[in-house]
Every structure is written in structure tokens, then in C-alpha cells.
Amino acid sequence: MLTSSDFRELLNLFEKHKVRYLVVGGYAVMKYSEPRFTKDLDILIASDSENANAVYAALKEFGAPLANLTSDDFTQQDYFYQMGRPPLRVDIMMSIPGIRFEDAWGNREVVEFDNMRILFISRSDLIQSKEASGRPLDKIDLDKLKQAEQLDALDEE
């Protein structure tokens, strides 16, 4: 899970700057099901101005390319920020299909890993987002998530 030192450094800076974020996408799928290849770290952030300022400050400290960007860009619901190259690319999104950040934030899962806290979207919110997306890879992820959910339910019996 998140073996890249760059990913860990970025998430530690998000913690330092009190960024409200959730790991979504492939790394979240792996948290709830089985390992799979992912070309990036997908992060959903709250798009309020206070959080946008914190995101910008964390990215600046990280050394991210921010030419022609301001913190206001991170308040735009349709904005998408990308840095790096696969498999170490980071995608920062202000919205994902089928989910409101505030609702997902209330359901977040906190994972303690390698002396750091990582904030993940909940499995149920991830499933809801994958259902809303409809992309072919999301359909595959959705099947794996639902299978893992069924296995977890059996383990609880």
C-alpha cells in the first residue's frame, strides 16, 4: 500500500497542512479488495477555499509544478490537477461521479500505515462512485469490490 516515498511525502504534507482529502481510485480499490496495477494515486479533495489554500500550500512545499495556478483553481468542481508520470502520477480531483465530498468525508476510513494516517473513501462510497462512473475499468473494480464485500460479510457470520 502506497510504497512510493513521493506519495507518502505528499500525504504527510496534506496532514501537516490539514488538507481534507480522500484516497479514491485504484489504491482505494486495493484497500477493500485485491491488489491490482494502478498508474496513479487518485485524491479527492474538499473544494472550499480554506481547503484549497491548504492544498496549494502543501503542493508548493512538495515542489509540485504550480505555474499559472492559484489556490482558487482548487475550488472549481470541474477542475482536475495532475502531476508526475505513471506509475507515480498524482491526480487531484474536486469531484468524482455519484459522490459529494462532504458525505464521503463523514464516512471516511482512516488507516495507520508506516507512522502516518491515510484517509480513504469508504467502501460503500467507492462502490457508489464506481457505479455512477460506468467506465470499463470501474465496472471491473466494482465486481471486485462487491465480491470482497460479500466475503467480508461471510467472515462476520
Give the positions of each predicted feature.
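Compositionally biased terminal segments of proteins
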Residues: 1-157
